[in-house]
C-alpha cells in the first residue's frame, strides 16, 4: 500500500491507554459474538481497526477510550457485512431498519436480534449516557443518516454503473460515519457544543471539510484493495469519468484532501467572530475544532500503516462471519 502524508493541523498523538483498551476490546467483540472463529479473530487483530479509537481520540482513557474503540470496531465490522458477497445483503438491510427503529423509537435489541444489533445497542447506551436531550436528538439523526446510506450503496452496486466523482463523494459522506464519530468526541470530552453554534453553517462546514479529508484519505488507502475486489473508489471514478490515468487520479484525490484541510482552517479562523455573534464561549468552539483536527490526524496516522488495507488474500476484510442474521433460537 502506498503511503500518503498530509499537513493535518494537529500533532500526532495516541492515547497512552491503547494497549489495555485493545486487550479489553478483544474480549468485548468475543462476548458480543462479533468475532467467533480463529480465522476471524486473527483477521480482526491483524486489521487493528479499533485502534483508530486511540488515534482519533488521543485524550480518552479508561471507560471513555473503551467506548471509542468499541464504536470504531463496530463500524468496520458493520461495513464489511455489505461486502461479503454471500447473499447476506437482505439481512444487512433489515439490520439497518432495526437499528433505525432502535434509535428513533427507542426499541431495544431482543434475544433474536443479530449480534451486530446487540453490540450497537450496547455502544449506544454508553454513548448517550449523561448527554442532553438536544445532543441525543442530533446524534440520533447522524446515526440514522449513516444507516440510510447503505441501501443506497447496495442499489448503486446492483445497478453496476460507476458513479461520477461528485455522486461518489455524496454517497461516501453518509457511509463514512464521520458525523456520529464527531458527536462521540463531545461525549468522551465531557462537553457539548451549544445548539446555536452546532447548527451554524460554519461548524457544519468544518464537519464537512473534515469528513471530506477523511474520505479522501480512505479512498487512497483502500484504492488497491477496492480495485482488486471490484468495489467503488474515488480514484477509479476519476479515471472512468475524468479521463485521467491512475497516477493522475491519485494526485487529484491528494489535492482534494489537502484542499479540504485548508478549507477547514479558513473556517476555523472565523470561530472567534462566530462565538461573539452567538454569545458562545470561544473555548468550547476551540475544543470542538481541536477534536475534529485530532480525529483527522488520528485517521491519517493510523491509515498510513493500517493492515486493514493490504490486498494479499484480503486479510484485512472482516466479513468472514454473518453478523446480520437473526437468531433462530
UniProtKB/Swiss-Prot annotation:
InterPro entries: Isoprenoid_synthase_dom_sf, Terpene_cyclase-like_2. One of its GO terms (molecular function) is magnesium ion binding. Substrate binds at residues 172, 225, 308-309. Mg(2+) 2 binds at residue 79. Binds 3 Mg(2+) ions per subunit. Its cofactor is Mg(2+). It is an enzyme of class 4 (lyase). Keywords: Lyase, Magnesium, Metal-binding, Plasmid. Mg(2+) 3 binds at residues 218, 222, 226. One of its GO terms (biological process) is farnesyl diphosphate metabolic process. Its EC number is 4.2.3.26. Belongs to the terpene synthase family. The Asp-Asp-Xaa-Xaa-Asp (DDXXD) and Asn-Xaa-Xaa-Xaa-Ser-Xaa-Xaa-Xaa-Asp (NSD) motifs are important for the catalytic activity, presumably through binding to Mg(2+). This is R-linalool synthase. It comes from Streptomyces clavuligerus.
Amino acid at each position: 500500500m502506498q503511503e500518503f502524508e498530509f499537513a493535518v493541523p494537529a500533532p500526532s498523538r495516541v492515547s497512552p491507554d491503547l494497549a489495555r483498551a485493545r486487550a479489553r476490546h478483544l474480549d468485548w467483540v468475543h462476548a458480543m459474538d462479533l468475532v467467533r472463529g480463529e480465522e476471524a479473530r486473527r483477521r480482526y487483530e491483524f486489521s487493528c481497526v479499533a485502534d483508530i479509537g486511540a488515534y482519533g481520540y488521543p485524550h480518552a482513557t479508561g471507560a471513555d477510550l473503551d467506548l471509542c474503540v468499541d464504536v470504531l470496531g463496530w463500524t468496520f465490522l458493520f461495513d464489511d457485512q455489505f461486502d461479503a458477497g454471500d447473499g447476506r445483503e437482505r439481512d444487512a438491510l433489515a439490520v439497518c431498519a432495526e437499528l433505525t427503529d432502535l434509535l428513533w423509537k427507542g426499541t431495544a435489541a431482543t434475544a433474536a436480534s443479530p449480534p451486530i444489533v446487540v453490540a450497537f445497542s450496547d455502544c449506544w447506551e454508553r454513548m448517550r449516557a449523561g448527554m442532553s436531550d438536544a445532543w441525543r436528538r442530533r446524534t440520533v439523526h447522524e446515526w440514522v443518516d449513516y444507516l440510510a446510506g447503505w441501501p443506497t450503496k447496495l442499489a448503486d452496486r446492483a445497478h453496476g454503473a460507476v458513479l461520477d466523482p461528485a455522486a461518489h463523494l455524496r454517497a461516501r459522506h453518509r457511509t463514512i460515519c464521520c458525523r456520529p464519530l464527531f458527536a462521540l468526541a463531545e461525549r468522551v470530552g465531557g462537553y457539548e457544543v451549544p445548539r446555536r453554534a452546532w447548527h451554524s453553517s460554519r461548524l457544519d462546514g468544518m464537519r464537512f471539510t473534515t469528513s471530506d479529508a477523511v474520505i479522501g484519505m480512505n479512498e487512497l488507502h483502500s484504492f488497491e484493495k477496492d480495485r482488486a475486489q471490484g468495489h467503488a473508489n474515488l480514484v477509479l471514478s476519476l479515471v472512468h469519468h475524468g479521463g485521467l490515468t491512475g497516477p493522475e487520479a491519485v494526485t487529484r484525490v491528494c489535492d482534494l484532501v489537502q484542499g479540504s484541510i485548508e478549507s477547514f482552517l479558513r473556517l476555523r479562523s472565523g470561530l472567534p467572530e462566530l462565538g461573539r455573534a452567538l454569545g458562545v464561549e470561544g473555548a468550547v468552539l476551540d475544543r470542538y475544532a481541536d477534536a475534529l483536527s485530532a480525529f483527522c490526524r488520528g485517521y491519517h496516522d493510523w491509515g498510513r500503516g493500517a493492515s486493514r488495507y493490504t490486498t494479499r488474500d484480503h486479510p484485512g476484510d472482516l466479513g468472514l462471519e454473518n453478523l446480520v442474521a437473526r437468531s433462530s433460537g
